[in-house]
Amino acid sequence: MIGCALALIALAGCKTPELSMDERISLPESGEMGMNDTTFVKPLSWDVFFQDTLLRGYVDVALRNNHSFRQSMERIAMSRAALQRAKGLLLPDVNLNIGASVNRFGEYTMDGVGNSETNVPSLPKDKHIPDPYRDFGLSLSFQWEADIWGKLTRKKQAAAARWMASVEATRFAQSMLISDLAIQYYELIGLDRRKEVLRNALASARRSHELTRQLKKEGAETQLAVDQFYARVLSIESKLLENDQLIGEKERAIACLLGVFPFEIRRMGFDELRKLPVPLSEGIPANLLTLRPDVRSAEMELIASKADVIAAKAAFYPSLVLGASGGFNAFD
């Protein structure tokens, strides 16, 4: 009885801890406005959303040359290789071994003396051990682990989920790259428009300053008014210099995103840009959350983590491994 009790205690101690897998949280079926509209916002690709042909060309260049985006593409290849490896765990491991060796026995060694005593005249010539001794071998073996606890299947599921997560992460990187490029491009157009406005303001300020200076000569204005308009001219000139500096920074930022140096940033005019249509879809924008690549990537990572937990629990159980081997061995 004491032995049985100790065995039960040992079995209870080897039991893996129970993990709660239920993370469901009750959420309201609709928002505060009570919208039950099932209309889904159709996602638009970037080449449809952006009507500017120059911006489209920049996006194409960025997707080909941006270093960060190319790294994310390589991570997809790494995840795909890990998935292929996980699939291979469910298949038998087959090995083919072909070997050849040459051994020369020393005259005053145990092997040398033993072989000289073994090669007696009464032994057939083809059974004598030669010196040097050439050995040849050919063998075939296989080993297969039965997936009785689902450990290997869960590993494959985790690898597949991580591959999908890397795909979604790459889509997220693409979305961020395109949005950053579009923001820099449109801000650059805005700076061009600001430069045009400042130039017009500078011309107007210079005319006002000259007019005030002439009026002062006639005694109709004071030196204070002349100095005020001159200060206005200097202020606008400083803003123009600052604006030119910002334009240079934006151009360098776009070139950095494109991965091409140096690069002349051609852009559309502000008035031309205003005439371009903006394609929009009808529906509830909140529904697009289900299509966000960062959300889907996090969901895939959660699925992979759950599969890893189940595989780790199954690793505590005994494994069933089947194997066999056979081959030929001879010497000359």
Descriptions of predicted regions:
Residues 70, 93-113, 125-132, 137, ...:
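Small/polar (Gly/Ser/Thr/Ala-rich) solvent-exposed segments
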Residues 15, 161, 168-284:
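Periplasmic alpha-helical coiled-coil/stalk elements that build and connect Gram-negative outer-membrane
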Residues 243, 293-294, 300:
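Metallo-beta-lactamase
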Residues 74, 78-81:
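Membrane-embedded segments
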Residues 1-64, 112, 122-124, 244-290:
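Terminal intrinsically disordered/low-complexity segments used for targeting and assembly
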Residues 297-319:
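Long hydrophobic segments that form regular secondary structure
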Residues 55-57, 78, 135-137, 183, ...:
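Transmembrane beta-barrel architecture of outer-membrane proteins
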